[in-house]
Amino acid sequence: MTLGLYRGFDYLTLRRWVKNVHGEDALRAIADKLAPLGYAGAVTDVILPDDWRPLAEYLEFNRAIDQVCGGEDAMMKLGRFSCDDQIKFYHRVAMRLMRPGWLLENSMALWRKYCDVGRWEVRWPRPHAATAYLYEMPLTEPTYCVAMMGFFERFLQLCGCRDVRLVHSECVARGGEVCKWEGTWR
């Protein structure tokens, strides 16, 4: 099984968030943390949105951001920023007109544009609740999963959902079979 590749677009989003919120010094500190692993290029290389880079590098980039920028709260904020950064204004207008369930199901179909491993499934235990499962992900990192939770939270808010509550109830990085996020909203 391949360890996977991740799209350059997301690397650029991570860099943008660190630079905007924490500054150039934080980017340099992250590059310094990644250098012994051979991944400083996540910060220093010219990366194009359509480039494919190692998933392991992307996950280590997330871990270094967590260490330099302040833990779980920072990763939730990064996830929310990623959603805002990647979903353009005209998409947001359309999102308000469609059902959150339909949008969530169809957005999961876009996964392969960002990562070449893993597979999403969404289940609906009741109308204002969903459980998202990420299967067949050879590597993951708890900080990445927290950022994903921030992304999901903001995504649902952009769909018009209120009082969004999410729990990452199972994680491959914590020994689980899958990564599982459970959410409710009004």
Each model region followed by its residue ranges:
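N-terminal leader/assembly segments
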Residues: 1-69
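Non-catalytic regulatory/interaction regions at protein termini and inter-domain linkers
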Residues: 4-9, 18, 126, 133-136, ...
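Amphipathic interaction/junction segments at domain boundaries or subunit interfaces
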Residues: 47-147, 162, 170
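Conserved catalytic core of nucleotide polymerization and phosphodiester-bond processing enzymes
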Residues: 161, 185-186
